């Protein structure tokens, strides 16, 4: 079966933020996972099943901290990568909150390519940890919608708040 379709290529320039922290990988990983808890998926399933109003979703959407992020997904590739010859501790996450994503989604569902945010941690050779994340606003401006771009700047601020809660410096790119 073939479908009629058109395509376009949208060049995107993204700022990747890398923070090298003088803290062991496991210490930062545990702190991150305590600060950005897993999404309570069962609670959201119940809200949908019960026909809850949007206000109930908003109240359940964010975490309990200043940044309001929760973890939607996480992956620990280290064991498999070790078999492949690279013994480097690593963890990847998708983080965000539904309330912020919904404000962008109503303008362009394509925001889901960038929300939730992808964040990665890995050990470096000096015994520290590298935290890597793409700057949200630099991704979201590619959708060419001012409301989405403004929310991207808000996500920059929230990401900076998270980094500070972890005891890391707020990068200049996240100081708007």
What are these regions (language model features)?
Residues 1-176:
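Feature detects long, helix-prone N-terminal segments enriched in hydrophobes
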């Amino acid at each position: 079966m073939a479908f009629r379709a058109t395509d376009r290529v949208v060049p995107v320039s993204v700022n990747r933020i890398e923070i090298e922290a003088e803290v062991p990988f496991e210490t930062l990983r545990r702190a991150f996972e305590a600060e950005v808890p897993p999404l309570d998926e069962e609670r959201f399933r119940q809200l949908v099943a019960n026909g809850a109003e949007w206000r109930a979703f908003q109240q359940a959407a964010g975490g309990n901290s200043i940044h309001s992020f929760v973890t939607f997904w996480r992956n620990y590739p280290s064991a498999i990568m070790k078999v492949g010859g690279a013994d480097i501790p690593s963890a990847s996450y998708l983080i965000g909150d539904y309330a912020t994503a919904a404000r962008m989604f109503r303008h362009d569902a394509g925001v889901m390519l960038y929300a939730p945010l992808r964040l990665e941690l890995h050990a470096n050779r000096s015994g520290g940890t590298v935290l890597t994340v793409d700057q949200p606003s630099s991704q979201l401006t590619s959708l060419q919608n001012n409301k989405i771009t403004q929310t991207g700047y808000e996500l920059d601020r929230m990401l900076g708040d998270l980094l500070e809660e972890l005891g890391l410096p707020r990068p200049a790119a996240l100081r708007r």
